[in-house]
Amino acid sequence: MKANDIKKGNVVEYNGGIYQIRDIERSSPQGRGGNVRFRFIMYSVPGGAKLDASFDADDNLPEVELLRRQSTYSYKDGEAFVFMDDEDYTPYMLDAEVIGTDAGYITDGLTGIFVQVIDDQPVAVQLPQTVTLEVVETPPELKGGTATKRPKPAKLNTGLEIMVPEYITNGERVLVNTTTGEFAGRAD
């Protein structure tokens, strides 16, 4: 696939690795006879290591077929996380090192997960934009401090720690943005 045909989300092979394109910058310098250059910000699959590379418009990058299978988190088997395909109930096992920091957002029965599969092998997961987690430990609200919105630390049921508004109490369910790791509101 030529560099000028690549779109965000495409999965390509580069330098012996497999990468997913996350961002594209196009530049056409005036002094080079109109040769358009593309700068790709891509992340390795699996692993998520960031790579920044530039290509000419006619550079060729082989495209890799990546399937995204909607799945539900099932259980943890030793150090591996097991996800169940929502359509055909295929179990996908991914090691804790592949899941990485996303493990802090995964709870029993979590739905809306996409397992990324290359050649029938699960290589990565894509979590929903927000997940609902329970606050298990946070300091009480300070009386008289309502004029300022000071955040306070809160430990969640998965072990994750985030900053929450003062009015959040122990036992409350909160929405957490899986991209930024920040408080996104109260859960219903």
Swiss-Prot record:
One of its GO terms (molecular function) is translation elongation factor activity. Pfam families: EFP, EFP_N, Elong-fact-P_C. Coiled coil: none annotated. InterPro entries: Elong-fact-P_C, NA-bd_OB-fold, Rib_uL2_dom2, Transl_elong_fac_P/YeiP, Transl_elong_KOW-like, Transl_elong_p-like_YeiP, Transl_elong_P/YeiP_cen, Transl_elong_P/YeiP_CS. PROSITE patterns: EFP. One of its GO terms (biological process) is peptide biosynthetic process. One of its GO terms (cellular component) is cytoplasm. Belongs to the elongation factor P family. This is Elongation factor P-like protein. It comes from Xanthomonas campestris pv. campestris (strain ATCC 33913 / DSM 3586 / NCPPB 528 / LMG 568 / P 25).
